[in-house]
Regions:
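Negatively charged, low-complexity tracts enriched in Asp/Glu with abundant Ser/Thr
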Residues: 1-22, 69-73
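Generic detector of intrinsically disordered, low-complexity, polar/charged segments
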Residues: 7, 13, 31-32, 64
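Enrichment for repetitive, rod-forming helical segments
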Residues: 11-13, 37, 61, 75
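Acidic, low-complexity, intrinsically disordered interaction modules
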Residues: 18-63
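Short, surface-exposed secondary-structure junctions/capping segments
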Residues: 58-75
């Protein structure tokens, strides 16, 4: 995991329940049922993730500058 991915992971973990975060073309917020909700700007894609690492893994598909994520390295 590169520095950009680590920084993003840290920012996501600091989100409060009523906070949100914009990254590229995605709106990320803490879900009231736990975890994180990720919605695309055009609202054509909505995903729910149990933890911040999964969010970073998902975003790395769209932003190659995040590098290889923990999930990809384990594969």
């Amino acid at each position: 995991m590169n520095e950009k991915a680590k920084q993003l992971l840290g920012e996501l973990e600091m989100l409060g329940e009523r906070s949100d975060f914009w990254y590229e073309d995605f709106w990320i917020t803490r879900s009231p049922i736990g975890g994180y909700a990720v919605v695309s700007v055009k609202r054509t894609l909505t995903e729910h993730f149990s933890n911040a690492q999964r969010v970073v893994d998902f975003l790395s598909k769209y932003d190659k500058s995040l590098g290889k994520t923990l999930y990809e390295v384990k594969l």
